[in-house]
């Protein structure tokens, strides 16, 4: 084999790390290398079909796409060859020498020494071609891009360590041929029956024919036998597809090693005709919060693959959904730009969104434990829904889960339907509090009255919660009410007695004195009976920006208007009584500043001048 332009190049450092981790972590499930390589061949065939729609000459007179397996027991090699799109030299370097995924380095550094966990993570990452090194100590690739001249083939070879060799070679037929030089002890992959078994397990569902070489022992003639069904799984009747086949197809399209939580396979006829196969994964992808994270459905038009990651068919808050849509109503030459503005796309998006929400409703109803697993993985993403999808806001609200004062656990398990179902008699609102952490929410002084009255409060501590609640204003006809905002209904809950009213009258000069002292540092000063153990709190007016929202603005680098608090004092608390008796103005100011700082610290978690607070506290303690 004559080679030109030969050079040795080093792997990207992430590739070396991935190879090392993969070989050691995936060894117990090593047969998946065959699934990964056949899956790549299927993708290469899909890409050729799509490109050939506008350039049929790319078929080069051979439109029968397939992948072929052959082995040589003497040489101990296994070869997987396809006649798909193929690669040129630049594509080989990009696809086999680097990992073009942002966040890869951080992901690989996060992997520890737990092999079971590592294999899940690496599998989820999508090992693809590199899985060949699980069973091979050397891998040779010969490829030629469809439409390129025969002398524009590319040779690539590596032993899976620091570098690889690349060169230009001649290759008559297009496509990619991967030869695995098997490690000692891997002879099982030189057995036709073993290969049939693995392919039957992992690749029966793909539309690309998988053929295995058979030799006539008498005359040495070679024939190719198809060993998979080679019918696109989604085109088959649901009754003819087993759960195992659905699971394996998910792993094929999602490059995930774990079984999905649930799936929905539907064929729709009428105004629009399409087939959809949608999956809810069991775990979040490692890069779900990465800005460059690829998501979306595979798009087929009349069973012809058009594109991966068609984001237009699913709202962003459902970006974890995997699967495909096969439409009869879109043109074969559809582009991402056309999809963006297409009425067909908008209708499909609406229908598929409702389908996924129905899947989640069913999961929540039929399998509470399964839904809790889903919520732990994807709850934060689903919380984006009320802001993004006004049409389905009520349905999304039913799917939300919260921690609450009803439980001692931080687990988010309470649905809004459950909360409403056990509301206290006469309770008209759904009460909640937002905070930086579950502990801060649970210990907030704002909850004292509710504990006393036995009223449940939802405890919200995810960063997105405050933003979500600005869009989620009511559920089942009942408005949401933050317990840290001013509200007449909360004052009514306090059940103020005549005795308390009289005491308040006597304290009016004290309140006026506090107002004069604090001036415009606060919006107002008032007495409250919402507290039992705490001397003072700060709250915001109903129309004022909340503390948590101001923190969100700050975290995003945006300037938020200063929050003006209402300062509420508990007239029955010993510290407030003591402060009201102080005649000396300087000492009075120390007491009020201390009470205000305590209230601000409880509300915000920080103070502008903590040293001054400590100094003041020490001074009053030693007085």
From Swiss-Prot:
For region A, the annotated ranges are: 1-336
What function is annotated for this protein? Molecular chaperone. Has ATPase activity.
HAMAP family in UniProt: HSP90
Q: Which GO terms describe its molecular function?
A: ATP binding; ATP hydrolysis activity; ATP-dependent protein folding chaperone; unfolded protein binding
Keyword Lyase: yes or no? no
- Give the top-rank taxon of the lineage listed in the UniProt record for this protein: Bacteria
The family database entries (Pfam families) matched by this protein are listed as: HATPase_c_3, HSP90
Q: Which organism is it from?
A: Serratia proteamaculans (strain 568)
Which protein family is named in the record?
Belongs to the heat shock protein 90 family.
> What's this protein's name?
Chaperone protein HtpG
Major location, coarse class? cytoplasm
Q: Which UniProt keywords apply?
A: ATP-binding, Chaperone, Cytoplasm, Nucleotide-binding, Stress response
**InterPro entries reported in the protein's UniProt record:** HATPase_C_sf (IPR036890), Heat_shock_protein_90_CS (IPR019805), HSP90_C (IPR037196), Hsp90_fam (IPR001404), Hsp90_N (IPR020575), Ribosomal_Su5_D2-typ_SF (IPR020568)
B: annotated segments? 337-551
Ranges for the region named C are 552-623
Q: Where found in the cell?
A: Cytoplasm
Is Cytoplasm tagged as a keyword?
A: yes
PROSITE patterns linked to this entry: HSP90
Q: How does it assemble?
A: Homodimer.
Listed GO CC annotations: cytoplasm
């Amino acid at each position: 084999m004559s080679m030109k332009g030969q050079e040795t190049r080093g792997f990207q450092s992430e590739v070396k790390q991935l190879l090392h981790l993969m070989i050691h972590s995936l060894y117990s499930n090593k047969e998946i290398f065959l699934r990964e390589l056949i899956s790549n061949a299927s993708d290469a065939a899909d890409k050729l079909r799509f490109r050939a729609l506008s350039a049929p000459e790319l078929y080069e007179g051979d439109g029968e796409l397939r992948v072929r397996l052959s082995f040589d027991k003497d040489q101990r090699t296994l070869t997987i060859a396809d006649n798909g799109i193929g690669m040129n030299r630049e594509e080989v370097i990009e696809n086999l020498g680097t990992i073009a995924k942002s966040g890869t380095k951080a992901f690989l550094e996060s992997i520890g020494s737990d092999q079971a966990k590592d294999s899940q993570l690496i599998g989820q990452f999508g090992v693809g071609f590199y899985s060949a090194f699980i069973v091979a100590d050397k891998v040779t690739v010969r490829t030629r891009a469809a439409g390129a001249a025969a002398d524009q083939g590319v040779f690539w070879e590596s032993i899976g360590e620091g570098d690889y060799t690349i060169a230009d070679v001649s290759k008559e037929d297009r496509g990619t041929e991967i030869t695995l030089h098997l490690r000692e002890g891997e002879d099982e992959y030189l057995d036709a029956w073993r290969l049939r078994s693995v392919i039957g397990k992992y690749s029966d569902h793909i539309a690309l024919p998988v053929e295995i070489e058979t030799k006539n022992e008498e005359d040495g003639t070679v024939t190719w036998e198809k060993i998979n069904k080679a019918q696109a799984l989604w085109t088959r009747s649901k009754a003819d597809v087993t759960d195992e086949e659905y699971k394996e197809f998910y792993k094929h399209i999602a490059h995930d090693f774990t079984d999905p939580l649930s799936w929905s396979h539907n064929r729709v006829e009428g105004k629009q005709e399409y087939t959809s196969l949608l999956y809810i994964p069991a775990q979040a992808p490692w890069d779900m919060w990465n800005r460059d994270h690829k998501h979306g459905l595979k798009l087929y038009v009349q069973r012809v693959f058009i594109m991966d990651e068609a984001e237009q068919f699913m709202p962003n808050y459902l970006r974890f959904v995997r699967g495909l849509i096969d439409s009869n109503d879109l043109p074969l030459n559809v582009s991402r730009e056309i999809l963006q503005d297409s009425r067909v796309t908008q209708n499909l998006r609406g229908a598929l969104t409702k389908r996924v929400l129905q899947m989640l409703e069913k999961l929540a109803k039929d399998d509470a434990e399964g839904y809790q697993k889903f919520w732990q993985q994807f709850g934060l993403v689903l919380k984006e829904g009320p802001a993004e999808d006004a049409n389905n806001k009520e349905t999304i609200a039913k799917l939300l889960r919260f921690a609450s004062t009803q439980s001692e656990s931080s687990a988010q398990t309470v649905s809004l339907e459950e909360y409403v179902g056990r509301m206290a008699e006469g309770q008209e609102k759904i009460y909640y509090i937002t905070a930086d952490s579950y502990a801060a929410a649970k210990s907030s002084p704002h909850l004292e009255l509710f504990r006393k009255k036995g009223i449940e409060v939802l405890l919200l501590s995810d960063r997105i919660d405050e933003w979500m609640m600005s869009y989620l204003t009511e559920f089942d006809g009942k408005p949401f009410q933050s317990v840290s905002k001013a509200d007449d209904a909360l004052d009514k809950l306090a059940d103020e007695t005549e005795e308390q009213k009289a005491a308040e009258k006597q304290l009016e000069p004290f309140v006026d004195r506090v107002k004069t002292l604090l001036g415009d540092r606060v919006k107002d000063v008032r007495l409250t009976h919402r507290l039992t153990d705490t001397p003072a709190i700060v709250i915001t007016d109903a129309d004022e920006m909340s503390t948590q929202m101001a923190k969100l603005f700050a975290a995003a680098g945006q300037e938020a208007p200063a929050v003006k608090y209402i300062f509420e004092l508990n007239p029955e608390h010993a510290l407030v009584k003591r402060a009201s008796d102080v005649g000396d103005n300087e000492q009075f100011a120390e007491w009020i500043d201390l009470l205000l700082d305590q209230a601000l610290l409880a509300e915000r978690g920080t103070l502008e001048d903590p040293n001054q607070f400590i100094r003041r506290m020490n001074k009053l303690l030693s007085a």
